[in-house]
Amino acid sequence: MTVIQHLIKELKMIAHPEGGHFSESFRDENNNVSLIYYMLQKNEWSHWHRLTKNEILHFYKGDPITIFMSKDGIDFTSVTLGENENFHFVVEANNWFAMQSNGRFSLIGCTVAPGFDYADFELAPKNWKPKNFTLNNTKI
């Protein structure tokens, strides 16, 4: 069993609608806060989406992960989480964002307060991306 298979099994992860795998590890009884494990493997993307709440992303294990963000749907910025990078980052409410692992896999945690609710989640149309989005200086 590979490390990836082991983590998916041990953390009881399932496929996430935005891509990758996840499992909820904590939600308080009043839904004041929720926490999930989230994993992306090589060649997987967290599809562009946004929340109406701030989301804190925490790096746990594996390869660095890049978070791409856009406030206006035109321009974008990025930040990398990883062992020799940032350990956590806050994606502010209503910002579009997507993620990609920079290696075999990346395991992160995602904390939302008040707790996550799919009513606060918007998944962008399938081929949507910020107008000026580039990857490795190649406009896509």
Segments (PLM) and residue ranges:
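Non-catalytic, conserved peripheral segments adjacent to functional cores
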Residues: 1-90, 98, 103-140
